[in-house]
């Protein structure tokens, strides 16, 4: 796979990747067979895929929306399915009362979750759903359990049939078709969820020709979340999507990046700061923010740019911290 072979020789990678970053996209006629092959021919077909047992599915614009924001307030959803992804991560599916309803989320946005332990204050945490916004009936959350993390521990302790309070959506970075020529997603751990939401939105839209580069750091190989989904994107759109994986504790046979996401790696795989209309997104644990981009001052204040990205010459306007 490209992502694993790429680290074997940094200089050829750099040359090849710069070419990838600046090459013109294929014409619409050459892309048409690809979109037809994967079934991406518009919202109607995407919705039909989820309702194949029925006649023609109603258009997305006609479906009710569950999350409306504003003064809607908190409401609860029932946990309907649990999938164990690895030793510390689960995919939790929460179903809507109306199975034809859509979430109402836009890309990129998150939801607030809440639960109140006995004799303690309510715990509120944001999560980015990984389910498609155009899929009716449910939302999926990918949740990694953290020691002494009250919300993640609560979510991992839940059983099918139990309920959880939600509120939202919280819009983080409103995406528009072809908003940028090239975006770069630098993620660590469960910071991958908003990155996947953004990448999925781009590649399911035939009109969006944005190029996407993913740099994803984890501790062990089994910690790489949504790897199957990203490999599918890489195989389907090799001209527009590249993924690079870095492990702090790799297995002996690992041929990808080792250690932490480094300045040398980012200098090699990211587009140069002088390129037009690029955007770099960062999401991960506090230590990664500090090293890569600097931390946010608050949910509404991006703070100053620092760390590796500043050292490489990127501007504050070219970087967004989830």
UniProtKB/Swiss-Prot annotation:
Its EC number is 1.6.2.2. May mediate the reduction of outer membrane cytochrome b5. The keyword Transcription does not apply. Gene3D superfamilies: Nucleotide-binding domain of ferredoxin-NADP reductase (FNR) module, Translation factors. It is found in: Mitochondrion outer membrane. It is an enzyme of class 1 (oxidoreductase). Pfam families: FAD_binding_6 (PF00970), NAD_binding_1 (PF00175). Residues 72-176 form the FAD-binding FR-type domain. Coiled coil: none annotated. This is NADH-cytochrome b5 reductase 2. One of its GO terms (cellular component) is mitochondrial outer membrane. It is a single-pass membrane protein.
């Amino acid at each position: 796979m490209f992502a694993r072979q790429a680290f074997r020789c940094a200089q050829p990678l750099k040359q090849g990747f710069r070419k990838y970053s600046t090459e013109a996209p294929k014409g619409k006629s050459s892309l048409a067979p690809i979109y037809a092959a994967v079934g991406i021919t518009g919202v109607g077909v995407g919705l039909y895929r989820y309702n194949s047992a029925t006649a023609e599915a109603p258009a997305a614009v006609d479906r009710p929306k569950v999350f409306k924001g504003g003064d809607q307030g908190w409401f609860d959803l029932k946990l309907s399915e649990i999938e164990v992804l690895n030793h510390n991560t689960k995919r939790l599916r929460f179903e809507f009362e109306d199975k034809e309803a859509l979430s109402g989320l836009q890309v990129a946005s998150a939801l607030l979750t809440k639960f109140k332990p006995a004799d303690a204050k309510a715990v509120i945490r944001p999560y980015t759903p990984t389910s498609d916004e155009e899929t009716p009936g449910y939302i999926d959350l990918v949740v990694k359990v953290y020691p002494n993390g009250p919300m993640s521990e609560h979510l991992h302790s839940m059983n099918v049939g139990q309920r959880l309070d939600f509120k939202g959506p919280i819009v983080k970075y409103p995406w528009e078709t072809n908003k940028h020529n090239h975006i770069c997603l630098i993620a660590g751990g469960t910071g991958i969820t908003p990155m996947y939401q953004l990448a999925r939105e781009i590649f399911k839209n035939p009109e969006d020709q944005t190029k996407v580069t993913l740099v994803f750091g984890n501790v062990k190989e089994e910690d790489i979340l949504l790897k199957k989904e990203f490999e599918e994107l890489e195989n389907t759109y090799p001209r527009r999507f590249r993924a690079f994986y870095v492990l702090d504790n790799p297995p002996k046979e690992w041929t990808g990046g080792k250690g932490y996401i480094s300045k040398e790696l980012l200098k090699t795989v990211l587009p140069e700061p002088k390129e037009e209309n690029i955007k770099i997104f960062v999401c991960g644990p506090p230590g990664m923010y500090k090293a890569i981009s600097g931390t946010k001052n608050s949910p509404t204040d991006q703070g100053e740019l620092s760390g590796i990205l500043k050292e490489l010459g990127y501007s504050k306007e070219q970087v967004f911290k989830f």
